[in-house]
């Protein structure tokens, strides 16, 4: 069963390794082509932000994260977090910390994993 939500999927990938960023981009392209899921990539030198602005299913979200975890270690820091009435995003940790939204901006903070 797939669960659909109107909103945006956001995955922030922290890396300065161009070869890894290229692999991440290929993973997003694969998702776009196979699942008709719109996902744009913005490169800010140390991060790749993937925004999916179409309705999406958790199945597709899981597939995207499976692809990413095959590229580098990604561990879940929280489950699905709802932001606002119609906006959702998944939050994941990278290199011992996590990104969170605070006052409309992404903030990086330490995060221990049990």
Residue ranges, per PLM feature:
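Short, extreme N-terminal segment that most often corresponds to the first beta-strand
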Residues: 1-29
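Charged interaction segments
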Residues: 27-114
């Amino acid at each position: 069963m797939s669960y659909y939500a109107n909103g945006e999927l956001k995955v922030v990938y922290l890396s300065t390794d161009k070869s890894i960023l290229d692999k991440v981009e290929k993973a997003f392209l694969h998702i776009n082509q196979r699942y008709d899921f719109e996902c744009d990539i913005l490169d800010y030198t140390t991060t790749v932000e993937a925004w999916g602005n179409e309705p999406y299913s958790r199945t597709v979200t899981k597939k995207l994260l499976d692809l990413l975890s095959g590229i580098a270690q990604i561990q879940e820091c929280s489950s699905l977090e709802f932001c606002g009435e119609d906006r959702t995003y998944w939050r994941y940790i990278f290199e011992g910390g996590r990104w969170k939204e605070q006052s409309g901006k992404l903030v990086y903070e330490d995060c221990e994993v049990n």
